[in-house]
Amino acid sequence: MLIRFKGAHIVDPGNINEQKDLLVKDGLVHALLDPGAADPEPGIDTVDVTGMLLVPGLIDLHVHLREPGHEYKETIQTGLMAAAKGGFTAVCPMPNTSPVNDNAQVTRFILDRAKAAGLSRVYPVGAITLGLKGETLAEYGEMKQAGMVAITDDGRPVENARVMRRAMEYATGLGLPVMSHSEDLSLARDGAMNEGSFATRIGIKGIPNAAESIMVMREIAIAELTHARVHIAHVSCEESVDAIRHGKQRGVQVTCETAPHYFTLTDKAVGDYDTHAKMNPPLRSEADRLAVIKGLQDGTIDCIATDHAPHSPLEKAVEFDQAAFGIIGLETSLVLSLKLVQDELLSMETLVEKMSRNPARFLGLDNRLIPGNPADITVIDPDRVHVIDPETFVSKSRNTPFAGIEVKGEVLLTMVEGRIIYQREI
Amino acid sequence: MRFEHKDILDMESLSVQDITMILDTAEGMKEISKRPVKKVPTLRGKTIVLLFQEPSTRTKSSFDIAAKRLSADSISLSKSTSSIVKGETLIDTARNLEAMNPDIIVLRHPSSGAPHLIAKHVNASVINAGDGIHAHPSQTLLDLMSVREKKGELQGLNISIVGDISHSRVARSNITGFTKMGANVTISAPATMIPRGIEALGCKVAPDMDSCIENADVIIMLRIQKERQENILFPTEREYAALFGLNAQRLKLAKPDVIVMHPGPLNRGVEISNQVADGRNSVILDQVTNGVAVRMALFYLVAGGSRNADTI
Ligand SMILES: [Zn+2]
């Protein structure tokens, strides 16, 4: 089966940034044709995507699909539907499910469910320690054989530095990167939003920037000691960006991600105790928001992930300090990130690096749009203006602070290995 | 002028005119408490629910007496006596209450913002009787009333607040309330008890207690919560009393006619010495009396008092 995407502007960093036609055959990128070139062979289905952007499929390194254990919030099936609709051809589910993904059986279960869904690719991330308890290392070797690609205790830090050291050493021996949920719990304790004048005003206990940056600095120091590859998850504040920048300059193998809410919103979004603006790490100050954007611009921040964290209204329609942390993001990530391009803060090429190329590198994948590579692509309608409406979400959950916001740009089509897994109804 | 607020949630949402109206109304209410028969029929037939999800005998009694003096039917619900059982959310509770058709709900709750959440789900007026570490507007209004009573006006006064600002809803509401009424507010505490960005509420932070109370017209001492000691806020009560306790010696730094206030209950010998607590500058008991009057005024006003005939 042959498909020709006709008329798109292809943005594939370091490879193509111009108008080309893309030919897909048998699940692979088959050829790139100049606009107007004749079909090289008969029997080609043409998809007219004139005026659209075509990019290598987006990859989200940080999602919570909630299955097994919390299927009332999300299932692998619904999470992957949301991923496809958001333009993601691959996602990395975090291990804090119930049971925890700290053994090969759970890893296999996740991959089986993902296969049954037949949507975006799934690269499971396993636990650093059994039960996320921070004590005993999980069996990374067997989990890797089952398909696990990295380790993290996300949702919790590894509190004991010696355990983290051993985890990094052991993972390095297996070629696995370590993702860090950087949070000093003794500093973050009881906090429900960013520490600062707004939290003081509304009487919510704060989480200081140092609760994050102190742990970022520790992880960099341990990575330096062990020569491990460490990836800092959901970077939210200026001090963390600085620490990572210095770590990179010293040659430490540190990468990191931020999420769209950290460069889009500040702690003021909490407003009148809106629990949809409650997440961990919390939304920070304007200075932090600008530092995150700076980090994206100068390459300190490698990736944009979502930290897609579905919660039902049971967890959110309560007192602010009692509410669960987390927001969903798969269906809003691209459009919120496109705003950086529209505001001329990032080039489209750099954005594709953050949302596709660098995450692929992290996973050891070659996702360039060159003949022979899998046809994982995302087609974006860059001009469509619309209002974010959670009622249209395919995720099981609705916990987003972005409802009602007008945005420009939308995913038109998502393809994994030559199969269209999402196409916007026109 | 009419009082247009359905709810009393914090001091921020009240204007200078609103506050003045509440204080004026409270002065009228205070007179009722001095009568031999301390009861008027103003709110007869109205139902007031006192929902206290955190223990506070003093505040609850004050609201209860205020309701009874206006002839309202008041019922008390607390965690143990109501259907507020584990698993029921605050919104469930609100809906259940709403089904009883109360006119006013007085809520004390350990979570900041809980009254805001309830107010969105009920038709009844909600009065915040203290939420988390956020706000305690009726306390602030009674403090404003006490100061206005003693000093004649609020504009230009120097107000000093000393104690655990971080964990105090009284401090937050008082800073907002007094600055809104034109007073200058200065706070002082060990640095562990000064929350970040508190200046944004309009107060100054003094480097030590002596400079905080220098030339004060009013000193408001806050209660030190001994149970917070696990948070390592200060080394010992002894040292706290020495650095941040109000004693007769220190009181001399303030204006001669300074008044001393405290929301109670007092830790005598810690934040305030016996001599000062019971001394001639203390208005601590007047605060309690004014508390009933202010709460009567709030009930009257949110129940539509200013829109009805004067039936006091
Ligand atoms: Zn995390």
Swiss-Prot record, chain A:
Protein keywords: Hydrolase, Metal-binding, Pyrimidine biosynthesis, Zinc
Binding site residues for Zn(2+) 2: 154, 181, 234
Stored InterPro entries: Amidohydro-rel (IPR006680), DHOase (IPR004722), DHOase/Allantoinase_Hydrolase (IPR050138), Dihydroorotase_CS (IPR002195), Metal-dep_hydrolase_composite (IPR011059), Metal_Hydrolase (IPR032466)
Biological or metabolic pathway of the protein: Pyrimidine metabolism; UMP biosynthesis via de novo pathway; (S)-dihydroorotate from bicarbonate: step 3/3
CC cofactor note: Binds 2 Zn(2+) ions per subunit.
Gene3D superfamilies linked: Metal-dependent hydrolases (3.20.20.140), Urease, subunit C, domain 1 (2.30.40.10)
Class in the EC hierarchy, top level: hydrolase
PROSITE patterns: DIHYDROOROTASE_1, DIHYDROOROTASE_2
Gene Ontology MF: a single term: zinc ion binding
Catalytic activity, reaction form: (S)-dihydroorotate + H2O = N-carbamoyl-L-aspartate + H(+)
GO biological process, one term: purine nucleobase catabolic process
Source species, domain of life: Bacteria
Pfam family, one: Amidohydro_1
Binding-site residues, substrate: 64-66, 96, 280, 311, 325-326
Cofactor requirement: Zn(2+)
EC numbers for this chain: 3.5.2.3
Active site: 307
Entry's family note: Belongs to the metallo-dependent hydrolases superfamily. DHOase family. Class I DHOase subfamily.
Functional summary from the UniProt entry: Catalyzes the reversible cyclization of carbamoyl aspartate to dihydroorotate.
Cited PANTHER family: ALLANTOINASE
NCBIfam families: pyrC_multi
Official protein name in the record: Dihydroorotase
Lineage: Bacteria, Pseudomonadati, Thermodesulfobacteriota, Desulfobacteria, Desulfobacterales
Gene this protein is translated from: pyrC
Swiss-Prot record, chain B:
GO biological process: 'de novo' pyrimidine nucleobase biosynthetic process; 'de novo' UMP biosynthetic process; amino acid metabolic process
Membrane spanning stretches: none
Pfam families referenced in this protein's UniProt entry, alphabetically: OTCace, OTCace_N
Binding-site list for carbamoyl phosphate: 58-59, 108, 136, 139, 264-265
InterPro entries: Asp/Orn_carbamoyltranf_P-bd (IPR006132), Asp/Orn_carbamoylTrfase (IPR006130), Asp/Orn_carbamoylTrfase_sf (IPR036901), Asp_carbamoyltransf (IPR002082), Asp_carbamoyltransf_Asp/Orn-bd (IPR006131)
Major enzyme class: transferase
UniProt keyword annotations, A-Z: Pyrimidine biosynthesis, Transferase
An annotated GO cellular component: cytosol
Catalytic activity: carbamoyl phosphate + L-aspartate = N-carbamoyl-L-aspartate + phosphate + H(+)
EC number(s) per entry: 2.1.3.2
Gene3D superfamilies for the chain: Aspartate/ornithine carbamoyltransferase
Residues that hold L-aspartate according to the record: 86, 169, 223
Pathway where this protein functions: Pyrimidine metabolism; UMP biosynthesis via de novo pathway; (S)-dihydroorotate from bicarbonate: step 2/3
Molecular function, one GO term: aspartate carbamoyltransferase activity
Family per similarity comment: Belongs to the aspartate/ornithine carbamoyltransferase superfamily. ATCase family.
PANTHER family according to UniProt: ASPARTATE CARBAMOYLTRANSFERASE (PTHR45753:SF6), ORNITHINE CARBAMOYLTRANSFERASE, MITOCHONDRIAL (PTHR45753)
Xref: NCBIfam families: asp_carb_tr, PRK00856.1
Chain's role: Catalyzes the condensation of carbamoyl phosphate and aspartate to form carbamoyl aspartate and inorganic phosphate, the committed step in the de novo pyrimidine nucleotide biosynthesis pathway.
Complexes and interactors: Heterododecamer (2C3:3R2) of six catalytic PyrB chains organized as two trimers (C3), and six regulatory PyrI chains organized as three dimers (R2).
Name of protein: Aspartate carbamoyltransferase catalytic subunit
Organism annotation: Desulforapulum autotrophicum (strain ATCC 43914 / DSM 3382 / VKM B-1955 / HRM2) (Desulfobacterium autotrophicum)
High-level lineage: Bacteria, Pseudomonadati, Thermodesulfobacteriota, Desulfobacteria, Desulfobacterales
UniProt gene name: pyrB
